[in-house]
A protein has these predicted regions:
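Generic recognition of short, well-ordered alpha-helical segments
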Residues: 93, 126, 208-211
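Thiol/selenol-based redox catalytic cores and closely related redox-interacting motifs
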Residues: 140-206
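Short, positively charged
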Residues: 32-38, 160-169, 222-226
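Short active-site neighborhood of thiol/selenol oxidoreductases, capturing the structured segment around
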Residues: 69-98
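Structural microenvironment flanking redox-active thiols in thiol-disulfide oxidoreductases
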Residues: 95-148
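A short, polar/charged loop-to-alpha-helix boundary motif
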Residues: 204-223
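N-terminal "domain-start" segment that seeds a small globular fold
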Residues: 33-70
Length: 226
Protein backbone atom coordinates (compact mmCIF):
# COMPACT_ATOMS: atom_id res chain seq x y z
CA UNK A 1 0.00 0.00 0.00
CA UNK A 2 1.33 3.45 -0.91
CA UNK A 3 2.25 5.73 1.97
CA UNK A 4 -0.16 8.71 1.87
CA UNK A 5 2.82 11.04 2.09
CA UNK A 6 4.58 9.56 -0.94
CA UNK A 7 5.14 12.38 -3.47
CA UNK A 8 3.23 12.12 -6.73
CA UNK A 9 6.53 12.03 -8.63
CA UNK A 10 7.51 8.85 -6.77
CA UNK A 11 4.10 7.30 -7.41
CA UNK A 12 4.48 8.11 -11.11
CA UNK A 13 7.93 6.51 -11.21
CA UNK A 14 6.50 3.30 -9.77
CA UNK A 15 3.60 3.37 -12.25
CA UNK A 16 6.02 3.79 -15.15
CA UNK A 17 8.14 0.87 -13.96
CA UNK A 18 5.04 -1.31 -13.93
CA UNK A 19 3.69 -0.14 -17.29
CA UNK A 20 7.04 -0.48 -19.08
CA UNK A 21 6.67 -4.25 -19.13
CA UNK A 22 2.94 -4.19 -19.83
CA UNK A 23 2.61 -1.85 -22.82
CA UNK A 24 3.81 -2.89 -26.30
CA UNK A 25 6.95 -1.07 -27.42
CA UNK A 26 5.20 0.62 -30.36
CA UNK A 27 2.46 1.94 -28.09
CA UNK A 28 5.01 3.34 -25.64
CA UNK A 29 6.89 4.96 -28.53
CA UNK A 30 3.70 6.60 -29.84
CA UNK A 31 2.84 7.99 -26.42
CA UNK A 32 6.40 9.23 -25.86
CA UNK A 33 6.43 10.99 -29.24
CA UNK A 34 3.09 12.66 -28.57
CA UNK A 35 4.24 13.80 -25.14
CA UNK A 36 7.41 15.28 -26.65
CA UNK A 37 5.29 17.13 -29.22
CA UNK A 38 2.97 18.54 -26.56
CA UNK A 39 5.77 19.76 -24.31
CA UNK A 40 7.96 21.22 -27.07
CA UNK A 41 5.76 24.24 -27.64
CA UNK A 42 5.85 25.53 -24.06
CA UNK A 43 3.03 26.96 -21.97
CA UNK A 44 0.35 28.43 -24.27
CA UNK A 45 0.55 32.22 -24.47
CA UNK A 46 -3.15 32.62 -23.74
CA UNK A 47 -3.20 30.80 -20.40
CA UNK A 48 -5.21 32.88 -17.95
CA UNK A 49 -3.00 34.69 -15.45
CA UNK A 50 -3.32 34.97 -11.70
CA UNK A 51 -5.27 38.06 -10.71
CA UNK A 52 -8.02 37.54 -13.28
CA UNK A 53 -11.52 36.16 -12.76
CA UNK A 54 -11.96 32.41 -12.77
CA UNK A 55 -14.21 31.51 -15.70
CA UNK A 56 -17.53 30.07 -14.62
CA UNK A 57 -19.57 27.71 -16.72
CA UNK A 58 -22.07 24.89 -16.82
CA UNK A 59 -20.79 21.60 -15.46
CA UNK A 60 -22.43 18.25 -14.75
CA UNK A 61 -21.89 16.48 -11.45
CA UNK A 62 -21.10 12.79 -11.08
CA UNK A 63 -24.83 12.04 -10.75
CA UNK A 64 -25.60 13.66 -14.10
CA UNK A 65 -27.12 16.80 -12.60
CA UNK A 66 -26.37 20.17 -14.23
CA UNK A 67 -24.80 22.86 -12.07
CA UNK A 68 -22.09 25.52 -12.38
CA UNK A 69 -18.55 25.72 -11.09
CA UNK A 70 -19.51 28.77 -9.01
CA UNK A 71 -22.35 26.81 -7.41
CA UNK A 72 -19.99 23.97 -6.55
CA UNK A 73 -17.60 26.44 -4.90
CA UNK A 74 -20.54 27.94 -2.96
CA UNK A 75 -18.66 31.15 -2.16
CA UNK A 76 -15.63 29.33 -0.79
CA UNK A 77 -12.04 29.58 -1.91
CA UNK A 78 -11.23 26.48 -3.92
CA UNK A 79 -8.57 24.28 -5.40
CA UNK A 80 -9.83 23.38 -8.88
CA UNK A 81 -8.05 20.43 -10.50
CA UNK A 82 -8.32 19.92 -14.25
CA UNK A 83 -7.54 16.33 -15.23
CA UNK A 84 -7.79 14.28 -18.43
CA UNK A 85 -10.19 11.52 -17.44
CA UNK A 86 -10.83 8.33 -15.50
CA UNK A 87 -8.99 6.41 -18.26
CA UNK A 88 -5.69 8.16 -17.44
CA UNK A 89 -3.58 6.27 -14.86
CA UNK A 90 -1.66 9.43 -13.93
CA UNK A 91 -4.94 11.19 -13.17
CA UNK A 92 -6.11 8.32 -10.99
CA UNK A 93 -3.00 8.28 -8.85
CA UNK A 94 -3.02 12.08 -8.59
CA UNK A 95 -6.64 12.42 -7.50
CA UNK A 96 -6.12 9.57 -5.06
CA UNK A 97 -3.06 11.35 -3.64
CA UNK A 98 -5.10 14.53 -3.24
CA UNK A 99 -7.77 12.55 -1.38
CA UNK A 100 -5.15 11.15 0.97
CA UNK A 101 -3.19 14.33 1.61
CA UNK A 102 -5.25 17.40 0.75
CA UNK A 103 -8.88 16.84 1.71
CA UNK A 104 -8.49 17.11 5.48
CA UNK A 105 -5.99 19.97 5.20
CA UNK A 106 -8.30 21.95 2.93
CA UNK A 107 -11.35 21.20 5.08
CA UNK A 108 -9.82 22.82 8.15
CA UNK A 109 -8.97 25.86 6.02
CA UNK A 110 -12.51 26.11 4.62
CA UNK A 111 -11.30 25.48 1.08
CA UNK A 112 -13.22 23.40 -1.48
CA UNK A 113 -11.56 20.79 -3.68
CA UNK A 114 -13.11 20.23 -7.10
CA UNK A 115 -11.88 17.97 -9.92
CA UNK A 116 -12.92 18.78 -13.50
CA UNK A 117 -12.57 16.77 -16.72
CA UNK A 118 -14.17 16.74 -20.18
CA UNK A 119 -15.47 13.20 -19.83
CA UNK A 120 -19.11 12.18 -19.62
CA UNK A 121 -20.65 12.19 -16.11
CA UNK A 122 -20.43 8.40 -15.81
CA UNK A 123 -16.66 8.77 -16.14
CA UNK A 124 -16.69 11.25 -13.26
CA UNK A 125 -18.67 8.78 -11.17
CA UNK A 126 -16.24 6.01 -12.05
CA UNK A 127 -13.30 8.19 -11.03
CA UNK A 128 -14.95 9.08 -7.74
CA UNK A 129 -15.97 5.54 -6.84
CA UNK A 130 -12.83 3.63 -7.75
CA UNK A 131 -10.60 6.07 -5.86
CA UNK A 132 -12.95 6.60 -2.89
CA UNK A 133 -12.99 10.35 -3.48
CA UNK A 134 -15.04 12.43 -1.03
CA UNK A 135 -14.65 15.67 -2.94
CA UNK A 136 -16.68 16.91 -5.91
CA UNK A 137 -15.91 15.56 -9.38
CA UNK A 138 -17.61 17.25 -12.34
CA UNK A 139 -17.69 17.12 -16.13
CA UNK A 140 -16.90 20.23 -18.19
CA UNK A 141 -18.66 19.24 -21.44
CA UNK A 142 -16.83 20.60 -24.44
CA UNK A 143 -14.01 21.90 -22.24
CA UNK A 144 -15.82 25.23 -21.96
CA UNK A 145 -14.10 26.29 -18.73
CA UNK A 146 -10.73 24.74 -19.60
CA UNK A 147 -10.86 26.44 -22.98
CA UNK A 148 -11.43 29.84 -21.44
CA UNK A 149 -8.43 29.20 -19.20
CA UNK A 150 -6.32 28.52 -22.31
CA UNK A 151 -5.16 25.08 -21.17
CA UNK A 152 -6.37 22.86 -24.03
CA UNK A 153 -4.45 20.37 -26.12
CA UNK A 154 -5.32 17.37 -28.28
CA UNK A 155 -3.68 14.02 -28.82
CA UNK A 156 -2.03 13.48 -32.20
CA UNK A 157 -3.09 10.78 -34.65
CA UNK A 158 -0.27 8.40 -33.76
CA UNK A 159 -1.19 8.53 -30.08
CA UNK A 160 -4.90 8.18 -30.91
CA UNK A 161 -4.15 5.07 -32.94
CA UNK A 162 -2.13 3.68 -30.03
CA UNK A 163 -5.00 4.40 -27.66
CA UNK A 164 -7.43 2.68 -30.02
CA UNK A 165 -5.19 -0.40 -30.04
CA UNK A 166 -5.73 -0.52 -26.28
CA UNK A 167 -9.50 -0.14 -26.67
CA UNK A 168 -9.53 3.52 -25.69
CA UNK A 169 -11.45 6.02 -27.84
CA UNK A 170 -11.45 9.52 -26.38
CA UNK A 171 -14.18 10.61 -28.78
CA UNK A 172 -16.47 8.10 -27.07
CA UNK A 173 -15.33 9.06 -23.56
CA UNK A 174 -15.40 12.85 -23.85
CA UNK A 175 -18.80 14.48 -23.49
CA UNK A 176 -18.38 16.45 -26.74
CA UNK A 177 -17.12 13.55 -28.87
CA UNK A 178 -13.69 15.09 -29.52
CA UNK A 179 -10.10 14.21 -28.60
CA UNK A 180 -9.50 17.55 -26.89
CA UNK A 181 -8.08 17.47 -23.36
CA UNK A 182 -6.98 19.95 -20.73
CA UNK A 183 -3.36 20.08 -19.73
CA UNK A 184 -3.26 18.84 -16.11
CA UNK A 185 -3.72 22.08 -14.20
CA UNK A 186 -4.40 23.23 -10.66
CA UNK A 187 -6.07 26.59 -10.09
CA UNK A 188 -6.47 28.25 -6.70
CA UNK A 189 -9.47 30.56 -6.61
CA UNK A 190 -10.27 32.96 -3.78
CA UNK A 191 -13.74 33.39 -2.30
CA UNK A 192 -14.46 36.27 -4.68
CA UNK A 193 -13.74 34.06 -7.69
CA UNK A 194 -10.32 35.50 -8.57
CA UNK A 195 -7.50 33.22 -9.68
CA UNK A 196 -4.63 33.51 -7.21
CA UNK A 197 -2.40 30.65 -8.43
CA UNK A 198 -2.34 28.52 -11.56
CA UNK A 199 0.01 25.62 -12.28
CA UNK A 200 -0.15 24.14 -15.80
CA UNK A 201 1.65 20.89 -16.64
CA UNK A 202 2.36 20.26 -20.32
CA UNK A 203 3.82 16.89 -19.33
CA UNK A 204 0.84 14.82 -18.18
CA UNK A 205 3.14 12.49 -16.24
CA UNK A 206 3.92 15.33 -13.83
CA UNK A 207 1.42 16.99 -11.51
CA UNK A 208 1.16 19.68 -8.83
CA UNK A 209 2.42 18.14 -5.60
CA UNK A 210 0.15 18.39 -2.53
CA UNK A 211 2.86 20.24 -0.60
CA UNK A 212 3.09 22.86 -3.37
CA UNK A 213 -0.67 23.34 -3.35
CA UNK A 214 -0.83 23.74 0.43
CA UNK A 215 2.03 26.26 0.39
CA UNK A 216 0.22 28.26 -2.28
CA UNK A 217 -3.11 28.05 -0.45
CA UNK A 218 -1.58 29.27 2.80
CA UNK A 219 0.02 32.20 1.00
CA UNK A 220 -3.32 33.09 -0.59
CA UNK A 221 -5.18 32.80 2.71
CA UNK A 222 -2.60 34.98 4.45
CA UNK A 223 -2.63 37.66 1.77
CA UNK A 224 -6.30 37.88 0.91
CA UNK A 225 -8.04 37.45 4.28
CA UNK A 226 -10.96 35.26 3.26
Amino acid sequence: MTDPHTPIADRVAELQRESASRLPADVRAAFDADLARATATGIPADVTAAGTAMPDGDVVDEGGHPTTLASVRAGRPAVVVFYRGAWCPYCNLTLRAYQETLVSELDVRGVALVAVSPQKPDGSLSMQQKNDLTYTVVSDPGNQIAGRLGILTATGKQARDAQMSLGLDLADINADGTHTLPFPTVVIVDAAGTIRWIDVHLDYTTRSEPAEILTAIDAVLANHHF
